[in-house]
């Protein structure tokens, strides 16, 4: 009797797990398609869209596969540092390296990988990785998503400590393992500079 009940319970759990996994697979690759197929908002709104790959505070570098749209573990960050903001790719854009533009969005709590996050670009951190341009757009959620940042409209509104944290992370996060590509920082651009970079990347993606 007990064995029958136990077997039924296990079967139910396995079925539930299977349905959960099936639901996850549908979420990842179902009718919505590849996350990078999402479109950027109309430029007149001055908003942008991020596909979150790495949550704020994370030390695992996740990447969404360009081909399958699934979330892959690319590597673990070897340095004892964590991402200072939610990090990911901007769908519908193409940077100079052929990949979507990278962006960081500051939030009060970490955002789940794979989520689409509408944000307001505040500026751009100019970087080079292995000698190649590798700019990072920096922003905050739009007011409808989180009104906490309603007064933050441009780079000058962002506390200097936040900018320093972002700089410190990118300055050292590739120091280990030895032989990693060299990263150099080359100052900040304001919201207008970030918007111009985004517009160029949207145009490049449409070619």
Report the location of each language-model feature.
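Hydrophobic N-terminal alpha-helices or hydrophobic patches in metabolic proteins across all domains
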Residues: 27-207
């Amino acid at each position: 009797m007990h064995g029958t009940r136990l077997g039924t319970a296990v079967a139910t759990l396995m079925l539930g797990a299977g349905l959960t996994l099936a639901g996850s697979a549908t979420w990842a690759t179902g009718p919505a398609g590849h996350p990078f197929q999402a479109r950027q908002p109309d430029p007149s709104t001055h908003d942008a869209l991020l596909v979150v790959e790495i949550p704020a505070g994370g030390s695992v570098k996740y990447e969404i596969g360009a081909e399958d749209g699934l979330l892959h573990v690319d590597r673990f960050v070897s340095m004892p540092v964590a991402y200072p903001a939610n990090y990911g790719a901007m769908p519908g854009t193409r940077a100079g390296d052929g990949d979507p533009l990278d962006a960081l969005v500051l939030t009060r709590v970490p955002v789940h990988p794979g989520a689409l996050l509408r944000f307001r670009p505040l500026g751009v951190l100019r970087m080079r990785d292995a000698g190649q341009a590798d700019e990072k757009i920096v922003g905050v959620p739009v007011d409808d998503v989180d009104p906490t940042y309603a007064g933050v409209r441009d780079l000058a509104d962002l506390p200097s400590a936040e900018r320093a944290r972002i700089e410190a992370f990118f300055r050292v996060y590739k120091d280990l393992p030895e032989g990693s590509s060299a990263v150099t920082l080359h100052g900040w651009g304001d919201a207008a500079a970030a918007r111009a970079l985004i517009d160029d990347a949207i145009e490049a993606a449409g070619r």
